[in-house]
């Protein structure tokens, strides 16, 4: 995992394309989630990014916050993700299921 992180960090430090940097931050945040480094993941996801990534960033932030036990913040993140994603499609349905699962676990 460390090798993947160092390679992704290199891309983040050297890439000129902002969309590529946005994607790399998303991947690094996922690794931080896997490592239970929730603050690092949130920091990456709170970084300014292209609008087209809003739904993806918010969804992963919801996952991070859920794992960190911050349920009300996770609900808010999932709601942002739903608002930013198209109303139809599988991904929208998955995020809706995550939000519904949090509501059931009150």
Label every PLM stretch briefly.
Residues 27, 56, 60, 67, ...:
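"A position-specific structural signal for the A-helix of alpha-solenoid helical repeats
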Residues 8, 62-63, 68, 77-78:
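A broad helix-preferring feature
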Residues 1-56, 61:
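Alpha-helical adaptor scaffolds
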Residues 50, 71-89:
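TPR/TPR-like (Sel1-like) alpha-helical repeat modules
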């Amino acid at each position: 995992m460390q090798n993947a992180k160092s390679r992704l960090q290199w891309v983040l430090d050297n890439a000129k394309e902002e969309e590529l940097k946005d994607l790399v931050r998303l991947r690094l945040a996922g690794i931080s989630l896997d490592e239970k480094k929730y603050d690092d993941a949130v920091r990456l996801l709170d970084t300014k990014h292209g609008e087209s990534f809003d739904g993806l960033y918010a969804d992963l932030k919801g996952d991070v916050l859920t794992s960190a036990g911050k349920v009300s913040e996770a609900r808010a993140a999932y709601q942002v993700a739903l608002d930013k994603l198209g109303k139809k499609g599988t991904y929208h349905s998955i995020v809706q299921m995550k939000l519904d699962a949090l509501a059931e676990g009150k």
